[in-house]
Amino acid sequence: VIGVVGVNVESVIFANNILWPDVPTNRELKKSDEEKYAIFLSDLHVGSSKFLPEDFDKFLKWINGDLGNEQQRSISKNVDYIFIAGDLVDGCGIYPEQDKELLTKDVYQQYRDCAKLLEQIPEHIPLIICPGNHDALRISEPQPQLSKDYAKPLHDMNNVVMVSNPSMVNINST
């Protein structure tokens, strides 16, 4: 995603400036001496009939160390970050006849239900949450972080960090 500042004359855009996302251009790979993990989730779609509650329940049991073999439980103990890259909820009115697929037709309730699920993740693990096209905000990028007006229960959680889309996040830094 880039931003272009310029003038549109007939069918030609004259660019005066290009705005690049906040992403570094160097490609230096940094590694930790410790075995640590980051989990990337997206498209939970809480509130939709397409949400997978049984699978998410298994994830919650695993991240809490209650599911999996010895190696899998060892990995769950070393999770330091969970990123959720958009579409926490299914939203309302996102596409025609969406209401036929919704189990929860109130977007505020969808966010409350989502928070109840995410509260089951150990509080020492930061949850970095980025919005998506089904979340309650504008679809076009860049998107601001999720609003307290809609997602207050998530904002109230001590381990939640709301970020914009796109955004740059520095983890495990000294």
Residue ranges and their predicted role:
Residues 1-174:
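Extended recognition/assembly regions associated with phosphoester-bond processing machinery
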